[in-house]
A protein has these predicted regions:
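Short, solvent-exposed loop/turn segments at conserved positions within beta-propeller repeat blades
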Residues: 49-51
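Edge strands and adjacent loops of beta-rich recognition modules
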Residues: 53-55
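Glycine- and small/acidic-residue-enriched microsegments that form turns, hinges, and capping elements
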Residues: 62-64
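C-terminal catalytic or substrate-handling cores of phosphate/nucleotide-
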Residues: 77-78
Length: 304
């Protein structure tokens, strides 16, 4: 989606993920309530960005309406967004977001935009969650996660860029024992670029996919099983599956949380990652970990 995701660890050692800010923000604020977030960090080993990243967002609640704005800044990539969440009462909630980003390539800067509309509804009788979303982005919009400032724009544009994406999902708790969720998506692309002026006329196909998750919590231990499958424009299928466990614990009167994920896919490889997070005080938290992906690549991270 192009969002910048940062993990914040609370005093109890549990992790909370915050997204800054280029996505639909579904949470509504009470009238007169303010929400302000600031974060700074260093890109991980999988990123081609250099230098630090600073992110900030602000939200304000009105009667039935939440307004939000935010920005993410790096020396080579800057993005800003604004959005609103409107409560529709019995009909659920509707959100609209827009984002604008500028990426500085080796041969100059390019700017683009994206918009996203989303609807969600929680059925009170069964506690079933429903959601539908649509997003569109211009061809020159560049996600921070895929941006490489060492390349030219043409080099980055050799592959297909997302044009439109539809998502639909449903979630359902079952008897207080576990929760099930399923979603499907369809994505269309701009034609792939081969030179500055020539494009394959038929390289504008669609891809589709589905995902499913089963999650539960046994006392303080969280367990999750996931599966996903997709089909590309050439009719080729792929799939992946994962299992994860998160265990909070206390050591020397400090609270921590450990997490481990095992994943596999169509090609048969197995990936394993593990991490540990904690907090020294109300203002300072940290996380560290590492692992091996299904292709044998090794990675590690450290954040604070």
């Amino acid at each position: 989606s192009g969002d910048v995701t940062m993990t914040v660890t609370g005093d109890d050692g549990r992790e909370q993920t915050q997204v800054f800010p280029l996505s639909v923000m579904a949470g509504q604020l009470s009238p007169g309530q303010h929400e302000f977030s600031v974060a700074a960090g260093i890109p991980d080993d999988d990123s081609d960005l250099e230098g630090g990243v600073f992110a900030a967002s602000y939200g304000y609640g009105l009667d039935g309406l939440t307004l939000r704005t935010g920005g993410v800044f790096n020396q080579d990539w800057q993005g800003a967004s604004a959005g609103a969440v409107l409560g529709l009462g019995y009909l659920g909630a509707l959100s609209a977001d827009g984002a604008y980003a500028t990426a500085k390539y080796r041969d100059g800067s390019r700017s683009g935009n994206k918009v996203k509309l989303a609807w969600s509804k929680q059925l009170a009788l069964t506690n079933t969650g429903l959601r539908v979303s649509w997003s569109h982005q211009s061809e020159e919009y560049e996600d921070m996660s895929s941006f490489n400032p060492a390349e030219t724009w043409l080099q980055q544009n050799q592959g297909r860029r997302t044009r439109d994406e539809w998502n639909a999902g449903i979630s359902q708790p079952v008897g207080g024992l576990f929760s099930l969720s399923a979603s499907g998506w369809q994505r269309s692309y701009y034609p792939a670029s081969t030179t500055g002026s020539y494009r394959y006329a038929d390289d504008n196909g669609k891809e589709t996919g589905v995902t499913g998750t089963l999650s539960t919590q046994i006392k303080s231990v969280s367990l999750s099983l996931g599966w996903s499958g997709s089909r590309n424009m050439n009719g080729e299928n792929t799939w992946s599956a994962s299992a994860s466990v998160s265990v909070p614990f206390t050591l020397f009167e400090r609270k921590y949380s450990s997490s481990t994920t095992v994943s596999t896919g169509k090609d048969g490889g197995t990936g394993v990652s593990t991490g540990l997070s904690g907090a020294l005080n109300d203002r300072f938290s940290y996380g560290l970990g590492g692992g091996r992906d299904s292709d044998g690549g090794v990675s590690s991270y450290l954040n604070a």
